[in-house]
């Protein structure tokens, strides 16, 4: 009886292990099939970081800082005034430039008035010469007849020569003044144009005492302080556009065989965890490894060289809508997974092959409309250049 029970136990145990083996086989087979169909073409790296533009804010003119409107982490819009400089010196310089323009216009305007004056003098000298010539021609036969003395004729001849010289002098003076004017309008005279440009430059210098944000974003790296004297080109702070961000994923060179531009990428951040998945696209593959572009690149010609698998940065775009819902910060750690399974991989470019016709980034906030000062310059010229 005990022998029968023992045999039953061994039989049940064999059935259990057989069933377990079948279950494990099915599980491993399913896992392998899933890996073969879905995960085999996935490459992943946790050596990935958020990258973005940190637009530097610098002064274009020198001056003392009177106002700092924002501090780090503040949100600003494109065109907002970030820093203001003292306007006293710039205002004085602009007023001087306007006064100088008015004086130059008045001085140049005299050339046009002198043109009329010289023209009248030429006409008068020509009349005098014509009268002297006629007088001399009348007296020549009279002198031959002895009606008048030779002395009187010589005096008439001297008058003719003198009037001829006066006419030539008047013509030369007229031509010299005409050469200065050269039939050019007053507002196009070189000295007037130069003074007008100086006025415009002074006006621009005054406008640039208000330093504006070129983009919409967040303040970072603020270093400027009220009372500080800044110079052109000095860095004051940076503005980070929240929507101009992407991921640089550093993949091993052995992983890049089937990576192509346009492939989909799933990205997980350490900030939000696995519950938030960002969806991106491969937009570019760097033309060198990170080590190749370092400040001190490796010298592999040395005798103690050790081969190390290199990593190549792959640029991955981010969905702007997802960025708005879950904002990221520059430098955050990410995990990027590229789906390299694509039947048209042969038609997908490994490197960019087209030239982009549109600029990558633009800002209208830094373009200053000069129409107000141009109108004012035109008024100064017209008011001081009345003929």
Curated annotation (Swiss-Prot):
It comes from the Bacteria. It comes from Escherichia coli (strain K12). Disruption phenotype: Mutants are more sensitive to nalidixic acid, mitomycin C and other stresses such as hydrogen peroxide or UV irradiation. Belongs to the membrane fusion protein (MFP) (TC 8.A.1) family. Keywords: Cell inner membrane, Cell membrane, Membrane, Transmembrane, Transmembrane helix, Transport. Residues 38-387 are periplasmic. It is a single-pass membrane protein. GO terms for biological process: bile acid and bile salt transport; DNA damage response; response to antibiotic; xenobiotic detoxification by transmembrane export across the cell outer membrane; xenobiotic detoxification by transmembrane export across the plasma membrane. Part of the tripartite efflux system EmrYK-TolC, which is composed of an inner membrane transporter, EmrY, a membrane fusion protein, EmrK, and an outer membrane component, TolC. The complex forms a large protein conduit and can translocate molecules across both the inner and outer membranes. The gene is emrK. Part of the tripartite efflux system EmrYK-TolC, which confers resistance to various drugs. The chain crosses the membrane at residues 17-37. Pfam families: CusB_dom_1, HlyD_D23. Residues 1-16 are cytoplasmic. It is found in: Cell inner membrane. This is Probable multidrug resistance protein EmrK.
């Amino acid at each position: 009886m005990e022998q029968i029970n023992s045999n039953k136990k061994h039989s049940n145990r064999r059935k259990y292990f057989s069933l377990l083996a079948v279950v494990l086989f099915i599980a491993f087979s399913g896992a392998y099939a899933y890996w073969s169909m879905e995960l085999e073409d996935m490459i992943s790296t946790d050596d990935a970081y958020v990258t973005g533009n940190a637009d530097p804010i610098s002064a274009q003119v020198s001056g003392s800082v009177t106002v700092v409107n924002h501090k780090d982490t503040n949100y600003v819009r494109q065109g907002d005034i970030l820093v203001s400089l003292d306007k006293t010196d710039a205002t004085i310089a602009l007023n001087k430039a306007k006064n100088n323009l008015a004086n130059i216009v008045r001085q140049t305007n005299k050339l046009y008035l002198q043109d009329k004056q010289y023209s009248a003098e030429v006409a008068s000298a020509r009349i005098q010469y014509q009268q002297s010539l006629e007088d001399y021609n009348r007296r020549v036969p009279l002198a031959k007849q002895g009606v008048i003395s030779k002395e009187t004729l010589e005096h008439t001849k001297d008058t003719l020569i003198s009037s001829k010289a006066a006419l030539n002098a008047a013509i030369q003076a007229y031509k010299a003044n005409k050469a200065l004017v050269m039939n050019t309008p007053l507002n196009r005279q070189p000295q007037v144009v130069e003074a007008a440009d100086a006025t415009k430059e002074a006006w621009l210098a005054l406008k640039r005492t208000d330093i504006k944000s070129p983009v919409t974003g967040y303040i970072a790296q603020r270093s400027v302080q009220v009372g500080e004297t800044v110079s052109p080109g000095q860095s004051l702070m940076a503005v980070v556009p929240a929507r101009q961000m992407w991921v640089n994923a550093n993949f091993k060179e052995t992983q890049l065989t089937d990576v192509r531009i346009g492939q989909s990428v799933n990205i997980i951040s350490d900030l939000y965890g696995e519950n938030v998945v960002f969806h991106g696209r491969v937009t570019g593959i760097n033309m060198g490894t990170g080590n190749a572009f370092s400040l001190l690149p490796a010298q592999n010609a040395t005798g103690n060289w050790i081969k190390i698998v290199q990593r190549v940065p792959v640029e991955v775009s981010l969905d702007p809508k997802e960025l708005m819902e879950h904002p990221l910060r520059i430098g955050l750690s990410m995990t990027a997974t590229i789906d390299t399974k694509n039947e048209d991989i042969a038609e997908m470019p490994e490197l960019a092959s087209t030239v982009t016709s549109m600029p990558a980034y633009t800002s209208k906030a830094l373009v200053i409309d000069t129409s107000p000062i141009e109108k004012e310059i035109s008024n100064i010229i017209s008011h001081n250049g009345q003929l």
